Each structure stands twice: as C-alpha cells, then as structure tokens.
C-alpha cells in the first residue's frame, strides 16, 4: 500500500508523533510525503519516505496526480484549519480528488489513528 503523508506547518509535530506511534505499521508500506513533512518524519523516525516538492511549491499537486493515477492508496493530511494557506486551491483540489477516486483521507489526528489502526 502507498500512503501519502502531508502536514501543514503547525501540524508537523502531530505528524511526527503519529509516525512514531505507528512506525511499525508504516514501515511495511511505501510512504510518500510533501518535502518538509517527509524530511521531518525521516529525521525523527527510521522510516523511508519518498519526498515530493513542498506543498506550496507543488507537492500537494504532485500527490493529487498520484491519487488521480491510482498510485496512492491512502492520504493522511493534517491540515491547519485556522491558518489561511497561500496554496488553498491546490489543497482543495487534492481533497476533491480523494473524494472522486474514493481514496481514504484523514485530515486530523484522530481520524488518522482510526485509519492507521486498520492498515
């Protein structure tokens, strides 16, 4: 299974903790992430992560293309709903593609834990 991991700046620490908590399970899958999120996960765990560009530089769109090409099976996107994002259209497009292609999507830690408990 290929899992995409994305986290806004204020949610990166939550993503690191999530990756640590589920490191054994995640290590059995192919992981892809936006640039900074992937780097931070690799710096804080033993997980290997293929890094795309940073979200604002097109990383969300790269992962969206993977979703559209049936190349990603699940997306964990820890969003910061209280901070405006300059690349909000890219984020909306990614979320829409997950719905269109019926790719499981978690946008907060609690939903991510529920999904990851089942992988």
From Swiss-Prot:
Keywords: Lyase. SUPFAM superfamilies: Methylglyoxal synthase-like. It catalyses: dihydroxyacetone phosphate = methylglyoxal + phosphate. The active site is at residue 60. One of its GO terms (cellular component) is cytosol. It holds the Pfam family MGS. Its EC number is 4.2.3.3. Residues 1-119 form the MGS-like domain. GO terms for biological process: methylglyoxal biosynthetic process. Substrate binds at residues 8, 12, 34-37, 54-55, 87. One of its GO terms (molecular function) is methylglyoxal synthase activity. Belongs to the methylglyoxal synthase family. Catalyzes the formation of methylglyoxal from dihydroxyacetone phosphate. This is Methylglyoxal synthase. It comes from Clostridium perfringens (strain 13 / Type A). The gene is mgsA.
